[in-house]
């Protein structure tokens, strides 16, 4: 083994050095505090669990199973999974460990591990931060979660130039149910919508039951007013479809009232998480970034695997992505060596004010502290901090 092989890291894994680690940790602390004052209680979840627990979403989210590292437990011989997403762990807590009646709000922050990057240039070990609301199936709960997500991004990053995408899988799902489509037809439509293949969609829907409605859903996916004009009266009278459309309208209106300058887009056929989400979906993007800063949605029934299905909505983000290209310039005060009481008191006072103070050791001098910005000097019997 060469020396280089001992310090090389796997693809998609990187060290976080002090200048950026300080930024990331500040973001984490402020985000947790932001969520705490809104009633979201912090939970810590284990880094490994039996795969049966972590794969509770595998039937509805095959992608999660594919990115989960699996190892054999040397104690029990059972298969363990290294968490790739903390959502199923929080679902287990809500369903079994802490079965609260009524609304429960949780937040979390911790490293997750992926077998492969989730998008171009992404890390395989994101620092995932998220918030989840259990026990309330309402538009108000969805709107609260979008508000919390946007508020957090506004505090930690910025909403200037940001773009919010809104969607609702209930529109497509209820239309499929109303039309009585087969699984193959449903899968084909989902693929066409994802590829935005309008010519192919027009051809495919010609002989499809409710075909004009399925075409309208793709053709006017980003314009709710035009969509309503081109949908049939039958589907507009459907209770489930109407509820989904109404939820999307109300959410859009309330977000516009709260953040009038925010660029908000609608895409009713954004179905990447169709088999996982059950209602409203949302994602916020920064300019010149392909991957979302944060994303989430409704996923009712997530705790069913643990014996307690409950309405749920939530979002998550990667703190490394939020803190990318941000580097802290930390002021460092250098104190001379010595054990005099007044010197030690001056050092303690500076640290109590939040300053970073490094005391010289042995034969060290200022040149041995390359990141020093200030020094503690004795003047007229008083210790003062001076800029270097």
Swiss-Prot record:
Domain of life: Bacteria
Keywords, alphabetical: Amino-acid biosynthesis, Cytoplasm, Histidine biosynthesis
GO CC entries: cytoplasm
Location in the cell: Cytoplasm
InterPro entries membership: aa-tRNA-synth_II/BPL/LPL (IPR045864), HisRS-like_core (IPR041715), HisRS/HisZ (IPR004516), HisZ (IPR004517)
Record Gene3D superfamilies: Bira Bifunctional Protein, Domain 2
Pathway per the UniProt entry: Amino-acid biosynthesis; L-histidine biosynthesis; L-histidine from 5-phospho-alpha-D-ribose 1-diphosphate: step 1/9
Gene Ontology BP, a term: L-histidine biosynthetic process
SUPFAM superfamilies: Class II aaRS and biotin synthetases
Xref: Pfam families: tRNA-synt_His
Chief site of localization: cytoplasm
Subunit structure: Heteromultimer composed of HisG and HisZ subunits.
Note: This function is generally fulfilled by the C-terminal part of HisG, which is missing in some bacteria such as this one.
Family: Belongs to the class-II aminoacyl-tRNA synthetase family. HisZ subfamily.
Function: Required for the first step of histidine biosynthesis. May allow the feedback regulation of ATP phosphoribosyltransferase activity by histidine.
Protein name: ATP phosphoribosyltransferase regulatory subunit
Native source species: Acinetobacter baumannii (strain SDF)
